[in-house]
Amino acid sequence: MQYNFKVEAFEGPLDLLLHLIHRYEIDIYNIPVAEITEQYLSYVHTMKELQLDVASEYLVMAATLLQIKSKMLLPKHEEDVLDNGDDFIDDPRQELMERLIEYKKYKQVATELKEREQERAQLYTRPPIDFTSLQQEEETNLPLDVTLYDMLAAFQKLMRRKKAEKPVTTRITRQEIPIEQRMTDILKQLEIQGGRQSFYDLFVDDEREIMVVTFLAVLELMKNQQIIIEQEHNFDEIFVSSYTKSA
């Protein structure tokens, strides 16, 4: 059964690289290419496994990273160093580093502009009559605590855990579950659990097909603003809450 799912919040390969740099506390001026290439390719592989619509620029960046990695492995000859002793320009990572720094600045400016726009909207809109509804509107516009890249990392961890727990011999019975049905099941499950549950507890079935559908259902519920995904710190457990619980 095929599930073609496009997630608009994936902003591109530079966004993914910045996410990895932040997640693993990497110095943007001294990127460990081998490590970040491995992590990047792992994310792209997971995106393909989930049948997300992976844009071609992700694959171009993967090729670029592999090329930089191969150049970093080449022996450095003395004659390749510039006469002034500054070998920084010869660093194969230089161009990528500059692109990441520029993109990071762009993202910061875009975030600031969005915040100012929201502030102006609050100042110049009609006087609020119902303060409860206003509070709900503001909460709806708040950014999610967890990015989709964090969700991919959590799914990778989940798959590794399920694989380790799985018996050596298993009998697979294929089930086809529509994403819409799984979305309804998740909302009911959250209601039973008081509106909040661990992300990992949503995946009670070990069958890969159902796990994929569950993950895509979570993404769809996030996009529809029917659930909130929360994580206190990097690598902490992720929790799923319904909007009615968080309001």
Swiss-Prot record:
Gene3D superfamilies assigned to the protein according to its UniProt record, in alphabetical order: 6.10.250.2410, Structural maintenance of chromosome 1. Chain E (1.10.10.580)
Pfam families reported for this sequence: SMC_ScpA (PF02616)
Subcellular location(s) per record: Cytoplasm
Quaternary structure, from the entry: Component of a cohesin-like complex composed of ScpA, ScpB and the Smc homodimer, in which ScpA and ScpB bind to the head domain of Smc. The presence of the three proteins is required for the association of the complex with DNA.
Protein name: Segregation and condensation protein A
GO BP terms in the entry: cell division; chromosome segregation; DNA replication
NCBIfam families per the UniProt record, alphabetical: PRK00104.1-1, PRK00104.1-4
A single GO cellular-component term on record: cytoplasm
Family (UniProt): Belongs to the ScpA family.
Superkingdom field: Bacteria
Keywords, ordered alphabetically: Cell cycle, Cell division, Chromosome partition, Cytoplasm
